[in-house]
Amino acid sequence: MRKLQKIILVSLVSISAFSWIMSVNQPDMMDIMISYNPVLIGLFTASWTAGMAAMMFPAIVPMVLLYNKLLTNEQSISVEALESKFSRLKVILFVGMYLVVWALTGVGLLLAWSVPMNSVVMSSDPKIVGIIFGSILIFSGIYQFTPLKNKCIGYCESPLSFFMRRWSNGVAGALKMGTFHGLYCLGCCWPYFLIMVALGWMNITWMALFAVIIFGEKIWSRGIWVARSVGIVLVALGILSSLGLIVIYDNTMGMDMQPVNNMVM
């Protein structure tokens, strides 16, 4: 492994580890969820982006390392000088645009999904809440079997296929490819974040669970089977929740998952 590749690997892992620490110790998101204050939204965006770095960076390591390798091959003349001046910049821009996609996604989820969702859930009957969350889980589970999911996960599983289709030279190319990779990743993973947001912003337990699932989907060559297995589980949980057999979210106590007999009345 070349020196620059080692630096990239260590940097991604270090940022991910630091972001996990930040996510564990971050402030409660509830005040931000009920407010459109720009300062609070900015704080949320920073916290959300740190959480995305924690969850997603381990899974994108193969993509970033291959990008660096392709840049090195492309810049075979005076490789050492070019690596120091351009390769690092392009890799940083590639990863940066990937994070920008997720940062904007977080703001969109907050304003268009979480705030109204929180308002509806907190004022609804527990049975209605069960149906709402059951519907979300069923919808997310069905998506795991769609052609769009299959296409997006294909590019995430195979970095080489992604670059063969989307390769673009220069700094602008790094920005463009980072954006496309972020969008493909979003297309692959958005149901998990829809669920995570609905059940509790940046809850460390859900973050860890979905991070493991995403890592399995992206790293394993049969990641689509991970996705479909998760889809089956989500649909099953959604049906049970809709029928009132389990409580996915208790709007009187907070996020929970328990048999209906233990439901708080």
Report residues per predicted region.
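Membrane-interfacial entry segments at the cytosolic side of transmembrane helices
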Residues: 124-131, 222-232
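Alpha-helical transmembrane segments of helical membrane proteins, especially in multi-pass transport
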Residues: 143-151, 173, 177-201
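Juxtamembrane transmembrane-helix termini in multi-pass membrane transport proteins
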Residues: 45-99
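Hydrophobic alpha-helical transmembrane segments in multi-pass integral membrane proteins
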Residues: 108-110, 180, 184, 239-253
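A small-residue-rich subset of transmembrane alpha-helices
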Residues: 82-114, 189-222, 229-234
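Histidine-/acidic- and/or cysteine-rich, low-complexity loops and terminal segments associated
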Residues: 1-50, 73-83, 117-126, 147-168, ...
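Alpha-helical transmembrane segments
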Residues: 39-57, 126-142
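Transmembrane alpha-helix/helix-exit interface in multi-pass inner-membrane proteins
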Residues: 103-118, 122, 131-158
